[in-house]
Amino acid sequence: MSDSKAVKDSSGLYEVERRARHAERPGFRISELQIGPKQQVPWHYHNNIQDTFYVLEGRLRIFVRDPKEEIQLEPGQSYVVRPGRAHLVTNGGETSATFLVLQGIGEYDYVPLVNR
């Protein structure tokens, strides 16, 4: 896999059931996403910011690299992905999963990983 160009807005790159921005300030933002059982946030990383995932409803599976791990989260649980660490987010259950993503501190970018 190789890096693609970094983008400032990833909302058009993958489909979700629902997406809402709860707060956005320079260097920090909070988003809420709802993904269906077959949906995912594709492999990507951020150069400057960390992602903190917090599950509200359903189950979430997060796959990360360097080192390779699989994290399973249920409501009330959270996980932090450091800057530069590639990750993939999938629904870990049979129903929709709703979660918050706290992103910061720094300038937002989304670098998708693509197959060679």
Place the predicted regions along the sequence by residue.
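Short acidic-glycine-tyrosine-enriched beta hairpin
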Residues: 67-83
